[in-house]
Amino acid sequence: MIIELKSVGKIFPKSQFRLDDISFNIEEGEIVGLIGSNGTGKSTILKMINGLIPYDKGNIYYQGKEVKSFSDNKLRQMRKDIAYIFQNHNLLVGESVYYHLALVYKLNHQKVNHDAINDILDFLGLMDLKQVKCHSLSGGQQQKVASAMAVLQKPKLILCDEISSALDTNSEKEIFNLLSDLREKYGISILMIAHHLSLLKQYCDRVMILDHQTIVDTVVPVKATLNQLESNYVDQVKEFLLHD
């Protein structure tokens, strides 16, 4: 098991929003989707997993060990093992695509693997743009660069926060294919937030549904039977995921 949340909660004192009793786990090599309407706390869950924001109750376990007990060095190592692809990528103005990919190795004090960089550029259709400054790229192309940086990190877990929102249909499928191939080749686990149910249904081993600030159900696409829930949103999502 790569990550586990047990009754995790988050309170925001200056607002009425809170997360309650978030419990789930992700196995090694598993692709898990997280779906929910806007404002239900999907991104907050990812940030708590990666340690970007603290959680107020419950426990998070990484590879079976409680994160709260980690030393600073252990936390740094965990964050190296968890790649986070944000919805709003932060690329350096004035620097090239290739510079950003080489930076992954430099930040980890590793020799730059030019072959690996060229392979990922070719896979994503960015080879002709490798010397182009990132601020000149389209939003979809910039998202591809951010995704490539995560892949080169060779993480144990990738957190994807609506990474396909700025991509056209073909580019979106390329990114999801890349993540799926990465899972198959390296056994990497992936937790992804997305609104395109057809892609979640196609690529995820299971999909968790977040409603009223808690996980209300977990669906194995197509294979499970539909349970009736009170939320119309949840019903509609499950109907789509469970039926061909």
Give residue ranges: language-model regions.
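Conserved ABC transporter NBD signature motif
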Residues: 58-66
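Helix-to-loop junction immediately C-terminal to a conserved catalytic motif
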Residues: 50
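The feature captures the beta-strand-to-loop junction immediately N-terminal to the Walker
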Residues: 35-37
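Conserved ABC ATPase signature
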Residues: 133-137
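Conserved ABC ATPase "signature" region
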Residues: 114-129
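Catalytic Walker B motif of ABC-type/P-loop ATPase nucleotide-binding domains
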Residues: 158-161
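Conserved beta-strand-loop-alpha-helix hinge in the C-terminal portion
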Residues: 214-238
